[in-house]
Amino acid sequence: MARKLYPIGLQTFERIRVEDKFYIDKTEYVYRMAHTDGTCFFLNRPRRFGKSLLLTTMKSYFEGKKELFKGLAIEKLEKDWISYPVLHFDMSMGKHMEIAQLERYFDQQLAEQEQKWGITNPAVDANVRLISLIQTAYRETGKQVVILIDEYDAPLLDVVHEDEKLEELRNAMRNFYSPLKGCEKLLRFVFLTGITKFSQLSIFSELNNITNISMDEPYAGICGITEDELVNGMRDDIEALAEKLNLSYEQTLAKLKDNYDGYHFTWPSPDVYNPFSLLTCFAKQKIDSYWFGSGTPSYLINMMRNFNFLPANLGESMEAGKDDFDAATETMTTIMPLLYQSGYITIKDYDEETELYTLAIPNKEIRVGLYRSLLPHYLTSKTAMCNTTIAKMSVLIKQGKIDEALQLLKSFWETVPYCNNTHYEGHYQQTMYIIFALLTNFRIIVEQHTSKGRIDITMETDDTIYVMELKFGKTAQEALEQIESKHYADAFAMSGKEIIKVGMSFNIKDDNTIVFDWKSSEI
């Protein structure tokens, strides 16, 4: 029997079911939310994580389309199948807009619904038009109205760092959403999704009863593909990929886990895989980076610069209280809320005694994608050549040929033009960290603390630990001598692995060419 086609790029539940495409059953979550306390709910998850599909699933459910749910969990749970009027607004295309464009976008969204409900002479103001829509739908059907808003925050994502523009767009959105409070008696269910969490007062100033389910344990697996769903529902897909890759089932599952797993949106939580990447991997029969290819995180790069957040910090686990990362992005004082809510870091552990969460990059796909996105900001040119150099270095390091690998790096640096704003040690340290972090087969730690001081870069392979010190304006010999005088290598004496000390240096010649050098020493 032929496998079902994957719904890559499709986010309409009705179409997926009618065309009999592959579907991970999330309808139990839909039923649970529809039959719990409260009317208005909010969920934030990273992009391409299934939020739009979830909303269209809810749309079909609240419209009473029982035939679409045959064989799914909700078929046995729901007894009444009442049809409600549904107003579905998609804000996902409202990006990169000035205020006038956003107001026209609101107009288009409202006009589509007004045509459906036969409203021919709408008012001018968006909030008045939404009130009219709710009242008309209620009057025409005699039933409370369901409102579904997809990617509510899309118009704001690119202007989080622009206070004046942010406030202007936020005011327009506040006006648009304001009827949700006044029309509360006419509403059966309201559900909003987005990537980031903006403060309730900034957009929903009148709506004080939103239930945020984003970190609620019962909804931990509402979006994405859990490990249980993968192993129990997609075994044939894993086996087909294993055959293509000439690997065992267990080896293939391990590779999928390393590349696409690792997300947790509360604790405890099931392991959650990135659904877009996982399904694309199965469709293409190739393990690759797919999530970054579907969108460039320009707003994230801008915010990292604004907060002076260094690439090296991404490689470290971070400890934080819930309010430090599950916070409103427009008032954040660190980059952590944006990194977490956008899916670049995720929850890895929780300490009940301190109430602190441990957060880190979820998987290899995110780590590689992030560092590749950051590389051009440290190397304004030669990025493609750098990626080629990194790939060749990885092979040599795996073979234990560290000197040959660093010779490649030396040759690369000779091609990089010098810029005045790079005349400091930190720039080269961060650039080198990105380069080494992209050596994805190895464990990289930057500024590792020991009892003797801080090691600039530590690289660990299957059988070797490289202890590296970087100097600017000094010699590689001086860098190597610091490793020895500070006894940095002592921290790894019990590792059972070979230890190699590497001193590295950068110098700028009179003709403004960059000179990279190194000296290595085995213990």
Regions found by a protein language model. Give the residues of each.
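Mg2+/Mn2+-dependent nuclease catalytic core
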Residues: E167-N171, F472-A489
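Structural motif
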Residues: V146, T464-Y466, I500
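Phosphate-binding site recognition
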Residues: M1-Y424, L439-T440
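Active-site metal-binding core of divalent-cation-utilizing nuclease and nuclease-like domains
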Residues: T136-T141, I435-D462, K509
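Domain-level recognition of nuclease-like catalytic cores that cleave nucleotide substrates
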Residues: A491, S495-I523
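Metal-dependent nuclease catalytic cores in nucleic-acid-processing enzymes
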Residues: F176-C183, P337-I345, T431-A437, Q482-V502
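Conserved catalytic cores of phosphodiester-cleaving nucleases, focusing on short active-site segments
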Residues: M432, I455-F472, K486
